[in-house]
A protein has these predicted regions:
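A metal-dependent, Asp-based hydrolase signature
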Residues: 24-58
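Generic hydrophobic alpha-helical segments
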Residues: 26-30, 76, 116
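Substrate-recognition element of Asp-dependent hydrolases with the DxDx(T/V) motif
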Residues: 54-106
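Soluble or luminal CAZymes and related metallo-dependent hydrolases
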Residues: 36, 64-71, 130, 134
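Alpha-helical elements of Rossmann-like donor-binding domains used by nucleotide-donor carbohydrate transfer enzymes
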Residues: 5, 25, 39, 43, ...
Length: 183
């Protein structure tokens, strides 16, 4: 009957919403290091009712990553050569970070250590942007003066959180807006 089909559709929709919320929760927990990559992969298999390997899950997760244009890497190298202290603060997971280090950052013999003095990752700090504590930790570990620092991020909420601590910000709305900054 139509009523039974409608009820089945509603149940299926609710399951889909629940599984989507569960996936977001898992990514959030992985993103701040509350669960390991192995635990994440196990949960992903349970959620999707599949028997795929950890390697297959990691490959699928990394497909969402985009190229870092050479122009950006050249600009980072130039800024560092000018004496700017460059740090990277990223809400990322080790799965993605390992891929970025291996595949996206290498450029003409350079690697991630050549661009940044230090890298701060949410999964390793057990905090994520826009939580003020992650910025405070970067300020402390990097020994930077907020009023003399510029934070570039694509999300307004992350910029606002940094501004609240006295850090100058630039919201990078388009993929490469920050390249136009006069530094």
């Amino acid at each position: 009957s139509i009523r039974r089909q409608r009820q089945m559709c509603i149940r299926d929709r609710e399951k889909l919403i629940d599984s989507n919320q569960e996936a977001k929760r898992l990514m959030g927990e992985l993103g701040v290091g509350l669960i390991s990559t192995e635990q994440f992969c196990d949960a992903a298999r349970n959620l999707t009712l599949t028997t795929v390997s950890n390697h297959q899950i990691i490959e699928a997760a990394n497909r969402m990553l985009v190229v870092i244009p050479d122009e950006k890497k050249r600009r980072l190298l130039k800024l560092k050569a000018k004496g700017y202290r460059l740090f990277l603060l990223s809400n990322t997971i080790d799965i993605h970070w390992d891929y970025c280090v291996e595949k996206l950052f290498p450029y003409q013999g350079h690697n991630v250590e050549d661009y940044f003095e230090k890298v701060f990752l949410s999964q390793r700090l057990h905090l994520s942007k826009p939580d003020a504590r992650i910025y405070e930790e970067v300020i402390r570990q990097a020994a930077i003066v907020p009023e003399e620092s510029l934070f570039i991020d694509d999300l307004q909420e992350n910029c606002v959180a940094a501004e609240n601590l006295g850090i100058h910000t630039f919201q990078n709305v388009e993929f490469d807006d920050w390249l136009d900054l006069e530094l």
